């Protein structure tokens, strides 16, 4: 992952590193764009999954070579910093990955209220 540039993924690696990283999957061709993804600082986030540390769905920090921490995951989904999640680490990642971004839900709610007030 250290060789994947910000905003990049496994196909941005040299051919030798692609083969090493992807192993047998390398020869299947096509797809698999979710593997070895590094977030970008300048673009919207990739879709957050419920299992960020699995090879098929991993999301790497844009600068550091590590998975995103729970609080970073929550910030991407616009949860307030003081929001408390309950459960195991896996359960918390699942809650955040399954969530609709807070700011998006709020905007949809306000739009619905405006629409209903016109009826």
Question: What function would you assign to each model-found segment?
Answer:
Residues 1-119:
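C-terminal target-recognition/interaction regions appended to catalytic cores
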